[in-house]
Amino acid sequence: MKERMSTIVLALSLLFLSIVSLFIGVIDITPHSLITGNFEQLEIFLISRLPRLLAILCTGIGMSVAGLIMQQLCMNKFVSPTTGATISSAQLGILLALLFMPESTLIGRAAFSFVTAILGTWIFVWFIQKVQFKEVVMVPLVGVMFGNVITGITSYLAYKYEMTQALSSWLVGHFSMVLRGRYEIVYLVVPLVFLAFIFANHFNIVGMGKDFSQNLGVPYNVILFTGLTIAAMITASIVTVVGSVSYIGLIVPNLVSMFK
């Protein structure tokens, strides 16, 4: 009963804050002006405020689910898209898109970001599987080092080809540039999260170890890399639109596990 009440309170709080956020910005918008049909404020509401809210919700949900998947599959509570080099790999993909396809659309940048994020996450997990000593701190430490190497490569390429300013928008997450027509790729989070829920039981089994999974007839490597691909695509779609949003995938799953 207590858990149900806390869930209701949190849901109502989210709804209330979401509604309030729609009327916060440089230009004042009031519910009365929307109801009375103020065209200018209605246009701002539909082009900027509503897309911003939807992007924020998709980002929070997506990064949390991606972090939970990675923690479950890696059997480590400190692994996330941030400490697993997924975000760094996605940023590298965006830079490559800017270098090789300067006129690329949002979809083109997202495609590059998907590929590099998936490959970077796969390499990270493959590498930690080869590490003999898998202490709780060792795995995320390896991920942070690997991510810093990728970030170093990204920074070097950006500096060499004078793309530092162009890349800066994706180095720090922000929602100020979220507008209608420039954020819709983040909607990929919704089907990917739904797909993650479908595979949730398989992820739990794989998280118990390779031998346990094989005894239950679950294809360990297939489920492992399917989960990592889902987490990487969620992260890449968010990074492409709003930039690097760090540590949500690390903090939120651990907070939920503390109270559930």
Regions found by a protein language model. Give the residues of each.
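Alpha-helical transmembrane segments in inner-membrane proteins
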Residues: 1-260
